[in-house]
């Protein structure tokens, strides 16, 4: 049994920072709302947010990890405090609200990856409704770095079985 968390190898993103990478692939406003939620609900993470998300190049994708149950409980408390704070600030209460939130942000051109908001495929809208997963990858990176720093994490390779990107 491991005494330190185990996570997949962090990926160096194609942008200079985690925030810039998010802005290219998703709607930056969602990450900025999450930042507000973190500062409201977990203010002791604010400096590390700036260090690892605003200015850091490494992101732990896939939400994959193995850790002691006590650490898992602490992570889940942090994760859901932040995600629930995000949902409240974004005024997302239902799945319908989430879909409308994404559609609106696409229509007003808040996604850099979609050159023409009028030609975004329905599959891409559906994919972008995975905001909770996208944000939780950033939260996992933040929590892991805040609590364990890189040197205390056993990093293992992983295989991504399928990748489908919508442009």
In which residue ranges do the predicted regions lie?
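ER/Golgi luminal nucleotide-sugar-dependent glycosyltransferases, focusing on the catalytic module
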Residues: 1-167
